[in-house]
Amino acid sequence: MGPLSAPPCTEHIKWKGLLLTALLLNFWNLPTTAQVMIEAQPPKVSEGKDVLLLVHNLPQNLTGYIWYKGQIRDLYHYITSYVVDGQIIIYGPAYSGRETVYSNASLLIQNVTREDAGSYTLHIIKRGDGTRGVTGYFTFTLYLETPKPSISSSNLNPREAMETVILTCNPETPDASYLWWMNGQSLPMTHRMQLSETNRTLFLFGVTKYTAGPYECEIWNSGSASRSDPVTLNLLHGPDLPRIFPSVTSYYSGENLDLSCFANSNPPAQYSWTINGKFQLSGQKLFIPQITPKHNGLYACSARNSATGEESSTSLTIRVIAPPGLGTFAFNNPT
């Protein structure tokens, strides 16, 4: 068997991305000393680039060969053929204008698109006894390298336990499968989750802090896989019951009263203070210098979340007493 002739102009092809996986099939009644093989150059090619299907170990004394799109060898799937005698190239209905067949049976596909993914069949015809040719078939499958996916969300800011969120893995990729990850692990399905039939869409019912993410999606096929960047839902919640610091309730007359209020909330809560039911100020802190018994009373802090519309409050009873040694008179008659 003579050496394989190199296809012309292959040195000008720039390679990247799209994976081709070859499934070798035995040739029917085709006696050869070596198995005909096909090599994808490059092994990976991205959409818009070129790929060469380089054929090795061609038998001698060939009449010609035909390339088909798919595994059905009919006129509709006929791409192109090469007739050895006369070096004639014939194009069929499946020819897109981007395919070039060479004298060594190799096929160049330029500007690869997603429609190019799938099976291809090479039909080799060997000279027989002058009346019949001996044929053989070689089929391989071309897989598009999966693009890096991204996650879109129907609502990135859901209210806790109240709203449903729909996450979608993009783009929609033919002949690909979808996987989901949460917190870096395979998705732990719960009664609050549901996947679409294709697994491309994830439904989250009544999102809680345990199901807020981060989420990742992965697109994979038999040739490659790619995972998205993580997406974490900004869960709107609260406010929880506020806490007043310090929780001291007794003060000496003349001390400063310096109170702070905090409630767990997203977004951060808005605070207001009342003393004995009367509004005092807005803000997280309440400061009164040199308090006296007239400042005795019920100090209440209210926290409100404008995003959830929820409000919560807590209170503290403050009692101001005379400093040690001044006695009851000083307490009842402050100066």
UniProtKB/Swiss-Prot annotation:
Alphabetical UniProt keywords: Disulfide bond, Glycoprotein, Immunoglobulin domain, Repeat, Secreted, Signal
One Gene Ontology term, aspect cellular component: extracellular region
Presence of keyword Glycoprotein: yes
Residues in the signal sequence: 1-34
Subcellular localization, as worded in the UniProt entry: Secreted
Pfam family, one: V-set
GO biological process, one term: heterophilic cell-cell adhesion via plasma membrane cell adhesion molecules
Family under the similarity heading: Belongs to the immunoglobulin superfamily. CEA family.
Name of the protein in its database record: Pregnancy-specific beta-1-glycoprotein 11
UniProt source species: Homo sapiens (Human)
